[in-house]
Every structure is written in structure tokens, then in C-alpha cells.
Curated annotation (Swiss-Prot):
<dbReference type="InterPro" id="IPR002684">
    <property type="entry name" value="Biotin_synth/BioAB"/>
</dbReference>
<dbReference type="Pfam" id="PF04055">
    <property type="entry name" value="Radical_SAM"/>
</dbReference>
<dbReference type="GO" id="GO:0005506">
    <property type="term" value="F:iron ion binding"/>
</dbReference>
<keyword id="KW-0093">Biotin biosynthesis</keyword>
<keyword id="KW-0004">4Fe-4S</keyword>
<keyword id="KW-0411">Iron-sulfur</keyword>
<feature type="binding site">
    <location>
        <position position="260"/>
    </location>
    <ligand>
        <name>[2Fe-2S] cluster</name>
    </ligand>
</feature>
<dbReference type="GO" id="GO:0051537">
    <property type="term" value="F:2 iron, 2 sulfur cluster binding"/>
</dbReference>
<dbReference type="GO" id="GO:0009102">
    <property type="term" value="P:biotin biosynthetic process"/>
</dbReference>
<keyword id="KW-0408">Iron</keyword>
<feature type="binding site">
    <location>
        <position position="128"/>
    </location>
    <ligand>
        <name>[2Fe-2S] cluster</name>
    </ligand>
</feature>
<protein>
    <recommendedName>
        <fullName>Biotin synthase</fullName>
        <ecNumber>2.8.1.6</ecNumber>
    </recommendedName>
</protein>
<keyword id="KW-0808">Transferase</keyword>
<keyword id="KW-0949">S-adenosyl-L-methionine</keyword>
<dbReference type="InterPro" id="IPR006638">
    <property type="entry name" value="Elp3/MiaA/NifB-like_rSAM"/>
</dbReference>
<dbReference type="GO" id="GO:0004076">
    <property type="term" value="F:biotin synthase activity"/>
</dbReference>
<feature type="binding site">
    <location>
        <position position="53"/>
    </location>
    <ligand>
        <name>[4Fe-4S] cluster</name>
    </ligand>
</feature>
Amino acid sequence: MAHRPRWTLSQVTELFEKPLLDLLFEAQQVHRQHFDPRQVQVSTLLSIKTGACPEDCKYCPQSSRYKTGLEAERLMEVEQVLESARKAKAAGSTRFCMGAAWKNPHERDMPYLEQMVQGVKAMGLEACMTLGTLSESQAQRLANAGLDYYNHNLDTSPEFYGNIITTRTYQERLDTLEKVREAGIKVCSGGIVGLGETVKDRAGLLLQLANLPTPPESVPINMLVKVKGTPLADNDDVDAFDFIRTIAVARIMMPTSYVRLSAGREQMNEQTQAMCFMAGANSIFYGCKLLTTPNPEEDKDLQLFRKLGLNPQQTAVLAGDNEQQQRLEQALMTPDTDEYYNAAAL
């Protein structure tokens, strides 16, 4: 295996300081070396257990410490989750992600989580989960059930992290990523722009991710969604160009990773999203809600895909099982009519 050089903070800072158009040009060149620039991975995220989380993440409406009006819900029944997965597949998603508001999963819930993974995989979808901290045995059980990806974000730089979260250390997050990797599960890990961090902190986050023994296969870059009742509700808005710049630097530093536009897309206009794709983003969450915050509706995404000439990426599925791909491709070729806008909900 070829030696992979480690990034330094000064190198990453230099990327952030490049003229934006030069940075975008470099990022697009890197992107085209490893990916089809017209292909975008489409994923769906479902909250399988909502609210009442004991953590104190200052951005999160699911924390039990903040009064956001969010109603806590118990872990969903397995069949409810699988029905949502069927709908996601019919709408064109190729990966189904399941998120639970926990510090860590309880052992009593593991059999249900395993059944969810097995059921999603049986549909020909990729399965992803985000459940908090994992033990080695839990990671291995999920791997044995067939889990493809595990999401556990670093959120920000090690230096700024303590300003946002105190109930889980940065090292705990790194340890969970290591356990997931050792179990043979692919890693999904990224962060949030807009927490009040500096450009140096954004560089520090990407430095941590890119310098992992193996960089994450998937890197979600979130724009802070400000929720009333959370400590960050009054944070300044993120400048669109600053966000696009972060996407571009992530693409250059992790050339073979999927860079995902995650939370905050509802706040972005089409032009901003288009520039994110130009900067190297090639994955989105598809659907009307990301856990507990809004996300663009499916029909808006299909419309944007058509305008930009983008296509949903196919995934390896069971032989002959390409129904969701055909459905989405048909929707992409349909004019802007009432029928088109209903296509994603079929």
C-alpha cells in the first residue's frame, strides 16, 4: 500500500486561504480523478429514537437539558423502521441511515437494532446507523448483522470541542471510530460549520478526519440549524462562501471519500448547493426531515438534479433489484408538472 502523507495544520490553513475560484478549480480536479462528477449518492435518515438524550451538545434539540418543544419518543418498532426503509427505497434512496438519541445503546436494544440492519440489507439498501458511543462487542454485533456504515461525528476541532460538548470527550469519539473500523464497518464522520468556531477550527476538524489511520469513507459537512431553546440558537449565520470553502477543502484532503451535504440544506438556495457540488460534494440526505430539523423535500431535490444535470448514484443491490433506480431516473426525465412533483412519493 502506498504511503499516505499526513496533513499539517499549516497546509490546511493554506488551502482555506486560497482564492475561492482557485480552490474550487483544484477541488473539482481532485473530484474528477476519483468520481463521476454527475453522480450523487442519495441517502435517507430516520430518527428511530427521538429526544431525551443525556448529552449536552449545545446545538442539539434532542438533548434533555434544553427546552425545545421536542417530544421524546421511545425506540421505534422494527417493522415501523422497515416500512420507512421501503418508502425511502421507493423514493430513490440507496442508503438508509438510522439515528438514535443516545449516549450509547443499551444491551437490551441490541437485538432490535440487529433486526433493523438485517431487514434494511434484505431490501438491497446500504445500512447506516448512528447510536452514540459503541463498545467493541456492540460494534462487532452490528458488523455481523451486516451494517455497512456507522456515523459518529467529531463535530469540530479538538481545541474548540469543549465549548460545545462536555458530556463526552473528543478521545471517546476517536475511540468509537477505531472500534467501528476494527469491526469491519465503514466510517462516516464529519462536523458542523457555524458553532462559533474559527477558520482554524474548521481546518483542525478536517485535519483530524484526514489524518485518521484510514480516512472516513463518508464525510458529512453540516451547516448549523439554529433551534430555539438550544444554547446556539442565536449564533451568527454561516456565510455561504465559507461553507462552500469547507466543502472544497474536505474534497481535496479526502479525495476518495464521499463528501455529504447534510443538515442545513433547507437554508441554502439552489445556487449555494450547486457551488457545493462544484466544490466536490457528491452525497445528500434525501427527504423532508433530518432527525428533527427540516430538509428539502424530495421533489425539490429532483428538480435541482435536473437543472444541474446530476444523477442519483446506483448502489450494489440484489440481482435484478433496480426498481428504485428506474423510478428516480424516470422522475428526473419528467417535466415540471403535478405528476412530476408526486413522483418521489410513489
